[in-house]
């Protein structure tokens, strides 16, 4: 009988499927996987070690940042105390060192504002500008807005009218506090008057009035200022 001749009653599946061969293939796969796992055991240990090392590094970093912030808060409090006893020059030196050491922390931003303010009080306007510009604090935080408002006043004190006006208006746009917006717009209006931009000053006073309630007593103050400036235009 030819090997391709099918016996009566024998189906194709019955003739082709070999249960023993299928089992052999499965056992071969299991043995192969077992051998691979044994051969790559060191690799698996390395991966596990790296995962553990990464987790430990993350925990260390979080602890480090927490300790840094705690140290910064404690150190800044100590500097505040030195200011209250009038050791101002020493306080400035300590604040400068503090800003460098704790750069990137909220306390460093607060120290920058404090250092800039001390230089402003001593009329060291150029130094104040250098400190505040170097910090480059964003107006996305309350401390950043304070720093930029202080920088605007330092520009103004140095007669940098264009920079001061632009900075005051930027602070007014960024702040959510009514008094900061009002003070910044009023400062910008004052600069425009100095530069004889009377119509520009009136525009800023008008913007202040629009933000005040109809019964706000301060409306009379700004209305009078507008009238005074309008008289200068004539």
Positions of PLM-derived features:
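N-terminal positive-inside, membrane-proximal cytosolic segments immediately preceding the first
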Residues: 2-49
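TPR-repeat structural position
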Residues: 88-89, 125, 161, 198
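Short solvent-exposed coil/turn linkers within tandem alpha-helical repeat scaffolds
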Residues: 101-108, 137-145, 172-181, 209-222
């Amino acid at each position: 009988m030819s090997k391709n001749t099918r016996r009566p009653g024998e189906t194709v599946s019955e003739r082709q499927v070999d249960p023993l061969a299928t089992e052999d293939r499965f056992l071969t796969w299991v043995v192969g996987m077992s051998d691979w796992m044994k051969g790559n055991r060191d690799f698996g240990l390395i991966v596990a070690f790296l995962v553990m090392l990464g987790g430990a590094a993350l925990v260390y970093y979080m602890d480090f940042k927490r300790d840094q912030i705690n140290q910064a808060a404690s150190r800044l409090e100590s500097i505040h105390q030195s200011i209250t006893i009038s050791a101002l020059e020493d306080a400035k030196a300590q604040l400068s060192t503090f800003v460098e050491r704790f750069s990137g922390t909220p306390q460093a931003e607060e120290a920058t504002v404090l250092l800039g303010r001390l230089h402003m009080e001593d009329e060291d306007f150029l130094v104040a500008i250098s400190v505040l510009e170097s910090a480059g604090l964003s107006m996305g935080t309350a401390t950043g807005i304070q720093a930029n408002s202080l920088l605007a006043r330092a520009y103004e004190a140095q007669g940098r009218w264009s920079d001061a006006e632009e900075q005051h208006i930027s602070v007014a746009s960024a702040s959510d506090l009514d008094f900061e917006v009002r003070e910044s717009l009023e400062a910008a209006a004052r600069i425009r008057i100095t530069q004889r931009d009377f119509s520009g000053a009136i525009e800023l006073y008008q913007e202040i009035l629009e933000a005040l309630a109809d019964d706000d007593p301060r409306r009379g103050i700004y209305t009078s200022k507008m009238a005074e400036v309008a008289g200068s235009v004539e």
